[in-house]
Amino acid sequence: MAAVESVQCFGRKKTAVAVTYCRRGRGLIRLTVPIELVEPEILRYKAFEPVLLLGRSKFAGVDMRIRVKGGGNTSQIYAIRQSIAKALVAYFQKYVDEQSKKEIKDVLLRYDRTLLVADPRRCEPKKFGGRGARSRFQKSYR
């Protein structure tokens, strides 16, 4: 039995994690969350930025299945776009050729670095003596 050509990559934004399972296929991209239900509409385009940047021809021979968990709507969209981009680069590196992988990577990095590199910023924890991480309760002298 022949081995299935597949790669699995993840994208993260804050607490949202998207896992993309990428294998040879007909160009289908399936999400656990129906993309038509995402509001506002600009976020829908944001999720498929890698597809719009590289064109459908790069995705023609690849099927992608995406699971996303955690975070809010915007964080999930950013995690999805990162996992799609990383999965395509990994697939081209492993099963196609190094030259086309480098072209894809250069296009994505030139457009937006966060398509391939995760954003390390996290929410700062609350401390005592105030309502939040940095704000303090008002001080009274009398």
From Swiss-Prot:
GO terms for cellular component: cytosolic small ribosomal subunit. GO terms for biological process: maturation of SSU-rRNA from tricistronic rRNA transcript (SSU-rRNA, 5.8S rRNA, LSU-rRNA); translation. Its main location: cytoplasm. It comes from the Eukaryota. It is found in: Cytoplasm. InterPro entries: Ribosomal_Su5_D2-typ_SF (IPR020568), Ribosomal_uS9 (IPR000754), Ribosomal_uS9_CS (IPR020574), Ribsml_uS5_D2-typ_fold_subgr (IPR014721). Keywords: Cytoplasm, Ribonucleoprotein, Ribosomal protein. Belongs to the universal ribosomal protein uS9 family. GO terms for molecular function: RNA binding; structural constituent of ribosome. It comes from Syntrichia ruralis (Great hairy screw-moss). Disulfide bonds: none annotated. This is Small ribosomal subunit protein uS9.
